[in-house]
Curated annotation (Swiss-Prot):
<feature type="binding site">
    <location>
        <position position="39"/>
    </location>
    <ligand>
        <name>Mg(2+)</name>
    </ligand>
</feature>
<comment type="similarity">
    <text>Belongs to the TRAFAC class TrmE-Era-EngA-EngB-Septin-like GTPase superfamily. EngB GTPase family.</text>
</comment>
<dbReference type="InterPro" id="IPR030393">
    <property type="entry name" value="G_ENGB_dom"/>
</dbReference>
<keyword id="KW-0342">GTP-binding</keyword>
<feature type="binding site">
    <location>
        <begin position="148"/>
        <end position="151"/>
    </location>
    <ligand>
        <name>GTP</name>
    </ligand>
</feature>
<dbReference type="InterPro" id="IPR019987">
    <property type="entry name" value="GTP-bd_ribosome_bio_YsxC"/>
</dbReference>
<dbReference type="Pfam" id="PF01926">
    <property type="entry name" value="MMR_HSR1"/>
</dbReference>
<feature type="binding site">
    <location>
        <begin position="59"/>
        <end position="63"/>
    </location>
    <ligand>
        <name>GTP</name>
    </ligand>
</feature>
<feature type="binding site">
    <location>
        <begin position="185"/>
        <end position="188"/>
    </location>
    <ligand>
        <name>GTP</name>
    </ligand>
</feature>
<dbReference type="InterPro" id="IPR027417">
    <property type="entry name" value="P-loop_NTPase"/>
</dbReference>
<dbReference type="InterPro" id="IPR006073">
    <property type="entry name" value="GTP-bd"/>
</dbReference>
<keyword id="KW-0717">Septation</keyword>
<protein>
    <recommendedName>
        <fullName>Probable GTP-binding protein EngB</fullName>
    </recommendedName>
</protein>
<dbReference type="GO" id="GO:0046872">
    <property type="term" value="F:metal ion binding"/>
</dbReference>
<keyword id="KW-0547">Nucleotide-binding</keyword>
<keyword id="KW-0479">Metal-binding</keyword>
<comment type="function">
    <text>Necessary for normal cell division and for the maintenance of normal septation.</text>
</comment>
Length: 220
């Protein structure tokens, strides 16, 4: 099966809000803790080995990377790789810059269609994961959680992690969050959940071009 995300390439790097590209194409943001496997997940979703890079020093990369998707001459969307968060040794000034950059981007970017939130399946819904959800909540846009590294769990542990995450997301629904909140298990190493994630992301950015000929299917 051919997926639109497989036509991805580096576009630009942004370190300040004023440098965000003015392009009107829809965007999907990828967020997650520094050790949640975000870069690896982006690479496997785009069927490339070195599209997204993880910093050698976790938490030190404080800029936003853009990857254009679709034909090179006429891209149809952008994937937006946000800085990883949660690394204890990040200096205070860098952390403040990160918080300002991410929170403002997530809350005000009109091109943004939704957020893919990466969580380590062994430690889902940390305090900082919840902060990301709460930053994004006022927009009413969808959040889809990838519970990464699920290959490190037993089948029952995976079931429990997914159930606990969905229960946690239900709390935001009960509190009045208007956007769609979904979650799935994911493993870049074992290629678990790839088709499900592909179809959902492409349903956000280009429903008519999604890889499933019968239309994209959203995760539960």
């Amino acid at each position: 099966m051919s997926f639109l995300l497989h036509q991805a390439r580096f576009f630009t790097t942004v370190n300040h809000l004023r440098d965000l590209p003015p392009s009107p194409q829809p965007e999907v943001a990828f967020a997650g803790r520094s050790n949640a496997g975000k870069s690896t997940a982006i690479n496997i979703l785009c069927n490339q080995k070195r599209l997204a890079f993880a910093s050698k020093t976790p938490g030190r990369t404080q800029h936003i990377n853009y990857f254009s998707v679709g034909p090179a001459a006429e891209p149809v969307a952008n994937l937006v790789d946000l800085p990883g968060y949660g690394y204890a040794e990040v200096p205070g000034a860098a952390k403040a810059h990160w918080e300002q950059l991410l929170s403002t981007y997530l809350q005000t970017r009109s091109q943004l269609r939704g957020m893919i939130l990466m969580m380590d399946s062994r430690r889902p819904l940390t305090e900082l994961d919840r902060r990301m959800i709460e930053w994004f909540a006022p927009t009413g846009k969808p959040i889809h959680t990838l519970l990464t590294k699920c290959d490190k769990l037993t089948r029952q542990e995976s079931v429990n992690a997914l159930r606990a995450t969905k229960k946690g997301l239900d709390e935001y629904r009960a509190a009045g969050y208007q956007g769609e909140l979904t979650a799935q298990l994911f493993s870049a190493l074992k290629r678990i959940g790839l088709d499900e994630a592909h179809e959902l992301i492409e349903s956000w950015i280009a429903p008519g071009l999604a890889g499933d000929p019968d239309g994209p299917v959203a995760a539960e």
